[in-house]
Regions:
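C-terminal helical cap(s) of enzyme catalytic domains, especially alpha/beta-barrels
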Residues: 295-299
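Core catalytic lobe of class I
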Residues: 1-293
Length: 299
């Protein structure tokens, strides 16, 4: 009896509507050519990367980030920010929802201009209110797609370990009007033009290298992150976000020496994270008080 050997050639897989569990020899082209993906931003040529001016590296600007004309186009590798929630205090006026969203669109349009090809934009935001609930994440997603950003995904920041118990419960132990207690925020991730951030062999040889450790990289690819909030009293800002948030984004999305922008710098957490990870930073805030606070924290 002759026993023939079976073929060792692997059969490639394709993406179905429900995805697949294994990715070896995987072809997703048919899926991404489907009607589901029609009408949304696609990979496109946005020009060549430009040099970021040396005199702007590691600087904080007291000014409105709707005008970042001093920054050349295609010169910033990452934007990480948490837009202000208390708009009336930060902008000295009580903006309507539409005015607030219009302001964000102006800022993120400027962000798109200054980002390098493949550069990433990361926005930390929480939905607000209860009567009714305002889904800021949905509005921001639409704004970013209208501008032309490619969406890469979203991360749930699980804050439950540091969440307090004092809050509006609605009706307690009753179906009359129970309210959800948000113990999470969102981290929305986008990119400009292409999903890949280019790096030449010469740049790598000159020190533009990855700094993230293997286990952290594996952990950061997961869509749920867990770390505590920052103390407003300790930092001196009404809504600070912890340095851990921008640090993770910076390590995950940039190389050493890259430039990180925060158009709503606030207390300076993004600048601190950039400094501590070997990146350069540029931040904007309209409040001189917060610019001074951020500069003090950077000493």
């Amino acid at each position: 009896m002759t026993v023939g050997r079976g073929s060792n050639k692997k059969t490639s897989t394709t993406t179905s509507s429900f995805g697949v569990s294994k990715r070896e020899s995987h072809d997703a082209s048919k899926y991404y050519d489907s009607k589901l993906y029609q009408g949304i931003p696609k990979v496109t040529d946005v020009g060549d990367p430009q040099e970021f001016p040396e005199f702007l590296r590691d600087s904080l600007v007291c000014g409105d980030s709707r005008d970042m004309s001093m920054i050349p186009p295609n010169s910033v590798q990452l934007m990480v920010t948490s837009p202000p929630y208390n708009v009336s205090k930060e902008y000295d006026e009580d903006l309507s929802l539409q005015e607030y969203l219009s302001m964000l669109k102006d800022v993120f349009t400027e962000t798109y201009r200054v980002l390098a090809p493949g550069g990433r934009a990361v926005i930390n935001v929480a939905n607000v209110g209860r009567k009714p609930y305002i889904p800021l994440t949905s509005y921001i997603n639409m704004i970013m797609l209208e501008i032309g950003f490619l969406m890469r995904g979203e991360i749930i920041w699980d804050k439950s370990a540091s969440a307090g118990t004092s809050c509006a419960w609605g009706s307690f132990k009753s179906a009359s009007n129970p309210c959800l207690r948000d113990v999470h925020e969102y981290i929305l991730v986008y990119c400009k033009g292409d999903f890949k951030l280019e790096r030449t062999k010469q740049e790598r040889a000159e020190g533009r290298e990855d700094t993230i450790e293997k286990q952290e990289f594996i952990d950061f690819t997961k869509s749920i992150w867990r770390f505590p909030t920052a103390s407003a009293k300790r930092i001196g800002h009404p809504a600070p976000f912890p340095e851990e948030l921008p640090r993770r984004c910076i390590e995950f999305h940039t190389f050493k020496g890259d430039v990180v922008l925060d158009p709503f710098m606030g207390s300076g957490s993004t600048a601190l994270a950039a400094k501590h990870t070997g990146r350069s930073y540029i931040g904007y805030d309209i409040s001189q008080e917060y610019v001074d606070l951020a500069n003090q924290r950077l000493l």
